[in-house]
Amino acid sequence: MKNSESIKEFKKLNSSEINEKIDQLRKDLFDLRFKQATRQLNETHQFKIIKKQVAQLLTLSKSQSNSQKSSD
């Protein structure tokens, strides 16, 4: 996984790929929390990066679903 995936790259994904990516990032976030609790985490900046990516994907997913509803 690249740390600097941009919204441009996310826009290329379809809705099922977006949902899969969200699930994967949430699992990564869970793993980071677990590592932090056991004091094994050295890269605390990863929290911010992953949370930002999840927010971008959720926003993109919502806007895609709204555009599909309005076109119907």
From Swiss-Prot:
GO MF, one example: structural constituent of ribosome
Similarity section: Belongs to the universal ribosomal protein uL29 family.
Species annotation: Prochlorococcus marinus (strain MIT 9515)
Protein name: Large ribosomal subunit protein uL29
Keywords: Ribonucleoprotein, Ribosomal protein
Pfam families hit by this protein: Ribosomal_L29
GO cellular component terms listed in the entry, alphabetical order: cytosolic large ribosomal subunit
NCBIfam families: L29
Any GO BP: translation
Keyword Ribonucleoprotein: yes
Ribonucleoprotein in keyword set: yes
PANTHER family named among the record's database cross-references: 60S RIBOSOMAL PROTEIN L35/50S RIBOSOMAL PROTEIN L29 (PTHR10916), LARGE RIBOSOMAL SUBUNIT PROTEIN UL29C (PTHR10916:SF0)
